[in-house]
Amino acid sequence: MKRLILLALALPMLLACANAQTAHKLKIVNSADGESTLEVFLPETPSGRAVVDCPGGGYSHLAMQHEGYDWAEYFNKQGIALCVLKYRMPKGDRNIPLSDAYNAIKTVRDSAAQWHINPHDVGIMGFSAGGHLASSVSTHAPFYARPDF
């Protein structure tokens, strides 16, 4: 009887997972050395908007799961493409993660037509150190890499 009750409680959660709104997932190399990647989660019904997500980790590691991938379903349900950036650690050179973020924005814009994204509706967000990176890109990036929001 307990198993039946547990199954009845778990079934809606399993169905919710099966009803995920992500249509396509792509992984793109974002740096010449291959250490930086961009994982793109495209929604079934695109709104034309995309967000580059920079997970945090104190510039010593990255919290890719709970500050990156776990947000894909939330954004995709709203028709927003989520692009989770695995940026390289600075190791004394602040330009390393900045260049990874610049490349990510440029990649999203360059692929906009193929991914059903408006190239003038690309934003950036981040958590902790990733939030610092996102704000630095928003205020210091050259025009081609500056996010729209």
Question: Which residues does each PLM region occupy?
Answer:
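Primarily recognizes the serine-hydrolase "nucleophile elbow" in alpha/beta-hydrolase
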Residues: 103-149
